[in-house]
């Protein structure tokens, strides 16, 4: 109601201005004719005239009415340069701020609801460089004054910042036009003031903030490097620390463009994904899925059987798969590609020097123009009393430790309700272990929507996992030789016996042991980088888990391109790391794959959306495969086919998601997916049918009624 009242008042003010032709009074000719009368009134009652003039100026600018330039000239003619400049400076800034706040109050919520995804990107830019943009616009008076006020109100810039920057930015222009007003008799046209030379001067002045920002950045960079001595020449163009996904891709790119690059790895080539994460876990999941299908053979018209297997053979298969993939990431392959691969520990001695302690005990120092930190992450270990006494494995160490066992641990506890915890819990339960999965929050997969988390819970339970959400692990105990985990829930303690404790509560970046502290490179759970993945030192970059914000192998590879290209060619052009379309998959059965926004994200960001859902039990191929659990859920702006985000639950969801990733990357809407031929019968048809559901919901009902009449007429 308040918004409507304010809009009505603005409408009355604007209508009155044009209805009573008040604009005809705000002309240069009328101002010159009335100057003598205005002077007389000012001499008779100076404070009253100043007060009225001030309020009129504020009202005119607040309502975004034309005539501000004439009023500014009038201030010079009436009050002189100093007084006129002061009056106009405050009146114009106050009026502009009122217009700014009115725009924000009246329109921001509506604009945010409709264009929230775009506004978020603008707000992020405004938060970083907003004052510079605003100052530039204010310094160059060719940009419409009222438009700046209204548009800035739609952004997240603070009102105080808007006021201060506006007053400073408009001061010089105000002074020029007020001073021109003191020579009113010599001005025949307003264009006499805004000569091309003057406007060019304002434009040059407008870039001053950016020049200043560049100078400040230059001084800051020189200050950062001040205590170090730059080498006269370099041994390498780039040194990469860490041979996981980010390190391998960074060094590969450098070698491809003929740069001289050294890749340093202290442990196994391929990093966590090959040796401890993605590859072994997916191999385990496959064995477990086959075992589960054997138990439910009757679903496929076969006899159901309890699988007999050797746990040691399962673990040997996993290590065999790692060995089969290892040549893809081997020292030999990357050496053949042109990368100098060194096995050893790297320490950054100064911004251009890396010291390497080789496996053979020798120490080598290399100077380099740029460094890429790709040291990855490690499992996070909670501060749990007694955990060292009872023993534990992490998602990294279990592959080596369990390979030593003849049989699967009978009783297992998995700490963690995220993707890793869910995948391991389900897999080990399907292989016959009694698994208890413990999660301190009230549901699994906290980043997913409620219905997805509920489906994941059902999948875990149907696989035999006992899921305890809302339980906090508080200590471990060894009682009469039996290992026990003590949990707390609802102020009550619960004790669970176990044979193996798997810790899967997340991962943390590897930040110590290679010189960050000595160089003063800032860290905050990850290495702090700018939009270009550069650290405090512009020639030192970070990529992968150590840089965040996502801990996915494919994101590490994605970041590696930006880190390598910016490190090698940043002096010509730099590229901001692009996180607009990041997919991920949780590989439980059924798989959960997502890209972009889900409902809880959209609600948190205040983005208006529509939901289109297609159930897998309606898909022919899913029915044929007896894999009908799941759905495709697409978020779009109201009334538009633009894809904001997609969640797919079902068989091969990770593969199905790729079509939506491509569509979002290249701004293809649901209409394009609907118009694409999909092979029958495939799971991929679910994507087309989801697009069809959206189209059906947005059918032009009015037009269809006329089409129906047409067909009825044609049957006569």
Where are the predicted features?
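Glycine-rich flavin
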Residues: 253-259, 264-408, 441-445, 451-452, ...
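A Rossmann-like FAD-binding core segment of flavoenzymes
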Residues: 304-305, 340-343, 347-361, 366, ...
């Amino acid at each position: 109601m308040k918004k409507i009242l304010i809009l009505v008042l603005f409408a009355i003010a604007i209508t009155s201005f044009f209805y009573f032709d008040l604009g005809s009074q705000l002309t240069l000719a009328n101002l010159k004719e009335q100057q003598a009368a205005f002077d007389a009134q000012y001499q008779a009652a100076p404070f009253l005239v100043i007060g009225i003039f001030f309020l009129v100026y504020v009202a005119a600018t607040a309502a975004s009415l034309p005539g501000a330039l004439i009023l500014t000239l009038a201030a010079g003619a009436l009050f002189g340069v100093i007084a006129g400049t002061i009056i106009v400076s405050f009146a114009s800034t106050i009026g502009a701020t009122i217009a700014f706040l009115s725009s924000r109050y009246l329109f921001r919520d509506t604009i945010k609801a409709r264009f929230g995804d775009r506004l978020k990107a603008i707000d992020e830019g405004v938060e970083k460089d907003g004052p510079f943009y605003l100052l530039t616009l204010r310094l160059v008076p060719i940009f419409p004054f009222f438009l700046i006020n209204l548009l800035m109100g739609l952004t997240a810039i603070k009102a105080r910042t808007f006021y201060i920057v506006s007053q400073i930015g408009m001061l010089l222009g105000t002074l020029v036009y007020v001073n021109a007003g003191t020579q009113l008799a010599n001005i025949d046209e307003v264009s006499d003031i805004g000569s091309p030379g003057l406007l060019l001067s304002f434009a040059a002045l407008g870039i001053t903030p950016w020049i200043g920002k560049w100078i400040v950045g230059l001084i800051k960079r020189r200050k950062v490097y001040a205590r170090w001595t730059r080498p006269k020449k370099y041994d390498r163009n780039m040194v990469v620390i860490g041979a996981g996904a980010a390190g391998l891709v960074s060094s590969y790119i450098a070698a491809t463009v003929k740069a001289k690059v050294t890749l340093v790895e202290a442990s196994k080539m391929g990093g966590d994904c090959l040796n401890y994460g993605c590859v072994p876990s997916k191999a385990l999941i496959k064995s477990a899925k086959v075992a589960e299908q054997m138990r439910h053979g009757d679903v496929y018209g076969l006899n159901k059987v309890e699988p007999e297997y050797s746990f040691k053979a399962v673990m040997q298969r996993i290590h065999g798969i790692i060995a089969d993939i290892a040549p893809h990431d081997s020292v030999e392959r990357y050496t053949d590609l042109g990368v100098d691969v060194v096995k050893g520990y790297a320490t950054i001695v100064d911004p251009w020097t890396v010291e390497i302690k080789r496996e053979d005990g020798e120490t080598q120092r290399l100077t380099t123009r740029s460094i890429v930190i790709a040291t990855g992450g490690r499992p996070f270990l909670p501060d749990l009393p007694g955990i060292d006494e009872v023993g534990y494995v992490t998602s990294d160490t279990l592959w080596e430790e369990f390979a030593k066992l003849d049989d699967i641990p009978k009783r297992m506890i998995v700490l963690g309700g995220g993707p890793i915890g869910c995948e391991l819990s389900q897999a080990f339960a399907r292989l016959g272990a009694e698994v208890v999965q413990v999660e301190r929050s009230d549901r699994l997969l906290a980043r997913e929507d409620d219905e997805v988390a509920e489906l994941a819970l059902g999948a875990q339970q149907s696989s035999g996992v006992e899921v305890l959400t809302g339980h906090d692990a508080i200590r471990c105990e060894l009682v009469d030789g039996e290992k026990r985990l003590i949990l707390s829930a609802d102020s009550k303690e619960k004790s669970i016996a176990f044979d193996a404790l798997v810790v899967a509560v997340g991962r943390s970046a590897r930040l110590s042991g290679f010189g960050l502290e000595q160089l003063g490179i800032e860290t905050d759970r990850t290495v702090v980088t700018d939009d270009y993945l550069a650290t405090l030192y512009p020639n030192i970059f970070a990529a992968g888990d150590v840089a965040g914000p996502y801990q996915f192998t494919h994101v590490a590879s994605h970041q590696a391109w930006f880190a390598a290209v910016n490190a090698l060619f940043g002096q010509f052009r730099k590229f901001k790391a692009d996180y607009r379309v990041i997919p991920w998959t949780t590989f439980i059965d059924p798989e959960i794959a997502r890209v972009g926004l889900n409902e809880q994200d959209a609600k948190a960001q205040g983005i208006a959306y529509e939901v289109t859902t297609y159930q897998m039990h309606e898909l022919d191929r899913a029915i044929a495969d007896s894999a009908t659990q799941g759905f495709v859920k697409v978020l779009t702006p109201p009334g538009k086919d633009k894809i904001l985000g997609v969640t797919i639950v079902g068989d091969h969801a990770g593969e199905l998601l790729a079509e939506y990733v491509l569509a979002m990357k290249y701004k293809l809407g649901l209409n394009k997916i609907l118009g694409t031929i999909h092979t029958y019968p495939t799971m991929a048809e679910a994507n087309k049918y989801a697009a069809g559901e959206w189209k059906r919901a947005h059918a032009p009902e009015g037009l269809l009624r006329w089409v129906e009449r047409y067909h009825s007429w044609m049957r006569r």
